[in-house]
C-alpha cells in the first residue's frame, strides 16, 4: 500500500477518534453514557439533558448508547414482534437471535428517524440517525429514553406516564390516558394550592429504594419544558377521569397495580423484563396510596384532590 494512502487513512482514523464524544448523565440515582462517534452536534441536540450531565459519578451505569453513521440500517432483521403506534410515531420492533432487539422509529410523517440494536437488557445500544436535524433529534431522544426505561427496569426504576407536582416535600403523580387532563390538573394545583411546584409533566422516573418510593425529574417532559434534577418521596398517585362532578376515592392495592402497570413503559413479550417491572409495581402499589379522581377541570377538583391525598 502506498505510504501516502496509509498516512491519509491514519489521519482519517485520528479525526474520527478526536471527534468522538461521550457524555454521562445521571437520572434517578443511576447513570447512562451517550457516545457520539460521528455526530459532533450531538450534545447540542439534547438541551433537556443538561441539568443531568455529570463529569464524574459513582452511580452505576445502566446503559451505554452509541450513535454512529451507517452502524444500523432500517431493514427488517430477526423476528418481527410488531409495529407499534406511540402517539403517532411508528416503532418497528424485531427480536434478534441473541435475545437483543432491533428497533426502527419513524417520525410523525412516517420517515425513519433512527434505527438501533440493543442487547437483551438494553445495557448496550448502537444506533444510527436519519434525516434533518429535527428528525435526528427526535430519533436521538427516543432511543435514549427507551434504553433508559428498559435498562432501568433492572434497577427497580420505572419510567411512568404522569404529571408530577411537589408540595411540602412530597410528590403527587397524576395518571391517565393522553388527553385526560393530567397537565391541566397539575396547573390547577400550581394556581390554587400555594407553594406547589411542577417536577415533570410527562415522563418522571420512580424508584423503590430501601423500602421508600421516590419520584425523580427526568429529561423527558413532553410539551412542557420542565427538566428538573430533583427528587422527592411519593405522597400519592391519582388516576384522573373526566366527569361532570368531582368525586374521589382511594383504590385498593390490586387496582393500584393495574393502573400503574398501564401507565408504565414495558414490553409484554419480554418475560424477564416484564416480570421485573411487575415485581417493582407490586412493591410500589403496596407502599403508596392511589386514588381515582373523576373530575372537572376546575379549582374545586384541585382542592378536592389536595385535601384528600395529602392527609
Q: Where in this protein do the model-derived segments appear?
A:
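A noncatalytic interaction/capping subdomain that flanks phosphate/NTP-handling catalytic cores
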Residues: 2-173, 178, 188-197, 205-311
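Conserved glycine(s) of the Walker
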Residues: 181
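Hydrophobic positions on the alpha1 helix immediately C-terminal to the Walker A/P-loop
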Residues: 185
Amino acid at each position: 500500500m502506498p505510504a501516502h494512502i496509509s498516512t491519509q487513512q491514519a489521519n482519517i482514523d485520528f479525526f474520527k477518534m478526536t471527534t468522538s464524544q461521550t457524555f454521562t448523565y445521571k437520572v434517578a440515582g443511576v447513570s447512562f453514557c451517550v457516545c457520539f462517534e460521528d455526530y459532533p452536534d450531538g450534545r447540542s441536540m439534547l438541551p433537556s439533558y443538561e441539568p443531568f450531565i455529570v463529569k464524574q459519578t459513582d452511580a452505576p451505569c445502566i446503559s451505554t448508547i452509541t450513535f454512529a453513521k451507517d452502524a444500523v440500517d432500517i431493514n427488517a432483521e430477526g423476528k418481527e414482534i410488531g409495529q407499534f403506534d406511540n402517539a403517532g410515531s411508528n416503532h418497528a420492533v424485531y427480536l434478534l437471535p441473541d435475545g437483543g432487539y432491533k428497533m426502527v422509529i419513524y417520525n410523525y410523517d412516517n420517515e425513519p428517524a433512527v434505527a438501533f440494536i440493543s442487547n437483551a437488557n438494553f445495557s448496550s445500544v448502537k444506533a444510527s440517525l436519519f434525516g434533518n436535524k429535527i428528525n435526528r433529534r427526535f430519533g436521538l431522544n427516543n432511543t435514549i429514553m427507551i434504553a433508559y426505561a428498559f435498562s432501568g427496569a433492572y434497577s427497580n426504576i420505572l419510567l411512568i406516564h404522569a404529571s408530577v407536582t411537589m408540595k411540602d416535600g412530597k410528590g403527587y403523580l397524576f395518571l391517565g390516558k393522553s388527553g385526560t387532563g393530567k397537565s391541566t390538573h397539575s396547573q390547577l394545583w400550581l394556581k390554587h394550592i400555594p407553594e406547589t411546584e411542577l417536577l415533570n409533566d410527562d415522563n418522571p422516573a420512580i424508584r423503590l429504594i430501601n423500602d421508600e418510593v421516590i419520584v425523580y425529574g427526568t429529561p423527558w417532559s413532553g410539551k412542557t419544558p420542565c427538566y428538573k434534577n430533583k427528587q422527592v418521596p411519593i405522597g400519592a398517585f391519582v388516576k384522573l377521569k373526566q366527569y361532570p362532578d368531582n368525586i374521589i376515592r382511594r383504590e385498593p392495592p390490586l387496582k393500584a397495580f393495574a393502573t400503574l402497570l398501564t401507565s408504565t413503559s414495558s414490553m409484554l413479550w419480554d418475560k424477564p423484563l416484564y416480570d421485573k417491572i411487575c415485581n417493582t409495581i407490586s412493591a410500589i402499589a403496596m407502599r403508596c396510596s392511589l386514588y381515582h379522581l373523576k373530575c372537572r377541570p376546575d379549582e374545586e377538583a384541585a382542592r378536592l384532590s389536595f385535601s384528600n391525598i395529602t392527609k
